A protein has these predicted regions:
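Short beta-turn/strand-loop junction motif enriched in small, turn-promoting residues
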Residues: 44-46, 66, 109
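Mid-chain, well-packed structural core segment of small domains
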Residues: 66-89
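Short hydrophobic/aromatic patches at helix-to-coil boundaries
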Residues: 3-4, 126-130
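Acidic-leaning, charged glycine-interspersed low-complexity segments
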Residues: 84-128
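Short, polar/acidic, helix-capping and beta-turn segments at strand->helix junctions
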Residues: 31-34, 46-50, 54-57, 113-115, ...
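Oligomerization/assembly interface segments of phage tail-like spikes and tubes
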Residues: 53-67, 117-127
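Small/polar-rich, solvent-exposed N-terminal microdomains that initiate assembly or binding
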Residues: 1-51, 78, 87-92
Length: 130
């Protein structure tokens, strides 16, 4: 399994264990209650070196809620980052969150009849094969 997939699975599992509603692959059904977490896209920048595989990956995490939930969304974004920092290793890889390369944004979304807000976290993670 790739470093990207192992991190994704570890993050999803950890967020669900904390009691968050977490979705991936497809957005949740239309009447899903807010707030919820959506594990969106990810990408990998591997490097091959003599001593093993290393690289950096990026995982996008979105927190969706109504416009009145801005504080909750902000707190959940911080919880996502804190949770990601606890993922130190999986069966195959060791991980380190690159906090100085991680970005968080709170964005308005007016594509529905209900004004929404999206917390957008771009986690940047260094990894190496154990």
């Amino acid at each position: 399994m790739t470093a990207q997939q192992e991190f994704f699975m570890a993050l999803r599992s950890a967020l669900k264990e904390q009691g968050h509603d977490v979705y991936d692959s497809v957005l949740p059904p239309e009447h899903t209650p807010y707030p919820f977490i959506y594990l969106a896209g990810s990408w990998n920048n591997p490097q091959d070196i003599k001593t093993g595989d290393i690289g950096k990956l990026t995982q996008i995490v979105q927190v969706w809620g109504t416009a009145k939930m801005r504080g909750t969304i902000s707190g959940m974004c911080e919880a996502v980052l804190a949770t990601a920092k606890t993922i130190k290793e999986t069966d195959t890889y060791a991980y380190h969150i690159r906090a100085n390369e991680t970005e968080q944004q709170i964005l308005n979304d007016d594509t529905t009849n209900t004004p929404l807000m999206q917390g957008y976290t771009s986690l940047r993670v260094a990894y190496s094969r154990r």
